[in-house]
C-alpha cells in the first residue's frame, strides 16, 4: 500500500474546499485537496450569483476572467405578472452582485490554494475512511495510481449534499424530503430580457414550494432555472421549467446550450458539523440559504474559517472535537441563527397561495423601498397582511 501523509485532507475542490485549503496552507498545515472530477468546476450546479461584498469578506480579488456579468438590481415577479423592481434608480445603495463563470471561478480558487502551498489531486475519489491512530486513513482510487491511501490528522468534508464524509464520520446530515428542493437549470441564449443587469425571481404555482429564476450572463444569455418542492410538485422539474420558458416572453425564443440538475437542501445548518478530526463545510454542512438555495457565499465563508481552525489545531497537535468547536461556534453565530429566520420566511412564502403572493408583491411594487433587505421587504408586506405574517413579527422585527 502506498500511503500519502498530510496534516489536512480536503475532499472536494468546490469553493468551500478550495478556501479551506487556501487558509490551512497559508497558516502552515500540509494540505491536500482531492476531487473525483477530471476538471474542477464542472459540471456547475447553481445559478452562479453572488453579492459583490462577499468576495471582499473572504479576501478574493475580483478577476474579469471569471465574471460573466455584473448585476445592479433585482426583479420579483408575482403569479399575475406584477413586478417589483429594485434598481439603481430606486435604491439609495444599489444591490450589486456578480454572475460567475463557475467553471473558471472554481478552478481559480483551487489555483489560489496551490499558490499558498496546497497540493491537489484531481480524478481522485475517496472510497472509504476509517480511524487510525490520531487521524483517519482514507482509501482512494486515483488517476495517477501513485497512492491508494491518504493518512490525515484532519479531514474536511467539502463533498456536497450527497457527500460521504459525513456518513463515514457518523455525522447525521440526512435531509427531510420536505426540505429538499429539486433543481433544474438551462443556460440559454437568444433571450429577450427586459433588463439584463438584474436577477429575476418568479414565485407561485409556476414553481410549487420554490421559485423560477433568470440570472443574466450576457446581453442575451442567462441561467434560467427552477427549484420545486419534492412534496408540493405535481409534475417533474423538467415539465415545470419547460412550461415556464414557453410562457415567459423573455425566454420563449431562447435556445438551450447547457443543462444542469441537482438537489438543494433547505434545512439550514446541520445540528452537528464536527467531530474528532473531521469538519464539514459548504453544502455538506448545510450552508445553503433556506430561502433561495444559494450557497456560494456561505461555502466560501465556511471553508475559510474551517481552514484556519484546522491549521490552528495542527499547530497545537490537538484534533479533538473540542478543539474544532471554534469552527462550529462561528458557523452557528454567523449563519445558523440567520438561517433559522430564513426558514420561517420560507415556510410563509412557499406556503402562500398565488392570490396571497400577488398581494404581497403588488405591495412591494407600490412601496418606496430605498434599501433592499429582508427586513425592509417583510415590513412592507406585513402592513397589508398582518394576520398572515404575524408569526414573523417576533422573529424578524
Curated annotation (Swiss-Prot):
Cofactor: FAD
Record-level GO cellular component terms: membrane
Cofactor binding comment, as recorded: Binds 1 FAD per subunit.
GO BP of this protein: glycerophospholipid biosynthetic process; membrane lipid biosynthetic process
SUPFAM superfamilies on file: FAD/NAD(P)-binding domain
Keyword hit for Nucleotide-binding: no
Chain positions recorded as FAD binding sites: 16, 35, 46-47, 49, 102, 126, 283, 295-296
Positions that bind a 2,3-bis-O-(geranylgeranyl)-sn-glycerol 1-phospholipid: 338
GO MF, one example: FAD binding
UniProt pathway: Membrane lipid metabolism; glycerophospholipid metabolism
Keywords, comma-separated and alphabetical: FAD, Flavoprotein, Lipid biosynthesis, Lipid metabolism, Oxidoreductase, Phospholipid biosynthesis, Phospholipid metabolism
Catalytic activity: a 2,3-bis-O-phytanyl-sn-glycerol 1-phospholipid + 8 A = a 2,3-bis-O-(geranylgeranyl)-sn-glycerol 1-phospholipid + 8 AH2; 2,3-bis-O-(phytanyl)-sn-glycerol 1-phosphate + 8 A = 2,3-bis-O-(geranylgeranyl)-sn-glycerol 1-phosphate + 8 AH2; CDP-2,3-bis-O-(geranylgeranyl)-sn-glycerol + 8 AH2 = CDP-2,3-bis-O-(phytanyl)-sn-glycerol + 8 A; archaetidylserine + 8 AH2 = 2,3-bis-O-phytanyl-sn-glycero-3-phospho-L-serine + 8 A
Entry EC no(s): 1.3.-.-
Xref: HAMAP family: DGGGPL_reductase
Function: Is involved in the reduction of 2,3-digeranylgeranylglycerophospholipids (unsaturated archaeols) into 2,3-diphytanylglycerophospholipids (saturated archaeols) in the biosynthesis of archaeal membrane lipids. Catalyzes the formation of archaetidic acid (2,3-di-O-phytanyl-sn-glyceryl phosphate) from 2,3-di-O-geranylgeranylglyceryl phosphate (DGGGP) via the hydrogenation of each double bond of the isoprenoid chains.
Note, other: Reduction reaction proceeds via syn addition of hydrogen for double bonds.
Similarity field: Belongs to the geranylgeranyl reductase family. DGGGPL reductase subfamily.
Name of this protein: Digeranylgeranylglycerophospholipid reductase 3
Organism: Methanosphaera stadtmanae (strain ATCC 43021 / DSM 3091 / JCM 11832 / MCB-3)
